[in-house]
Amino acid sequence: MTTDVISADLKTVLRRLKLGRMLDTLPERLVLARQQKMPHQDFLTLVLADEASRRDSLAVVLRVQRGHLDPALQLDAWDATAKVTFDRALLNELTTLRFLEAHAHVAIIGPVGVGKTFLAHALGHIACRRGRTVLAMRTDHMLKTLKHARLDNSYDAEVRKLLAVDLLILDDFALDTLDPTESRDLYEILTERHRAGSIIVTSNRGPDEWLITFADPLRAQSAIDRFTSNAYDLVIEGESYRQRLKPTLKSAAP
């Protein structure tokens, strides 16, 4: 099989146009074009489609990284034999991301270890693959970040980050009792994103227990009412899923 030599001039031009990665597949595409006597336009379409596909894949990787999503927590890695129960039809509906289109929210509720974070991140991965921006973080980490941001006058910038993404995932929501500043910050995020951007929360508590974690009952009632009135509740029950994620020793070869 004849291997086409890519000229130095072509390499230079491709790199100037930021198309240098096309060189990875260009030789084999040239061979294919010769074998199939491919018209020039079809060949150009083929190599540009390769580049578009590569850029799309890279964009997904970057969205996942910037969103702080766990690479291992994807729906195709979910253990279907796990002894947990939840509304599968609702999960299937959520994977369509129609809730994102409607700026609706999701509350994933259940005891410790049943896979709440797993499913939240799995939905985040689906969103990234479909071109949406995501940010996942623990609720306490978000509130600490906002508290520290007040000290260096970066508070407004941090809030903009939380409001700008298509999907905000808050893990361990309503886990701890909030002080007045934290209550106010959480109120701001929940109300500003109401019907403007979707939120997924994971929580060990049901929505009826969230109110007691806020320092300000009036703000709490307002924020929680906005959220719950526009949220799907995915309730998970059963044994700990987390044990299935434990590392295990592989059997040594005989």
Predicted feature locations:
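Walker B motif beta-strand of ABC-family P-loop ATPases
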Residues: 167
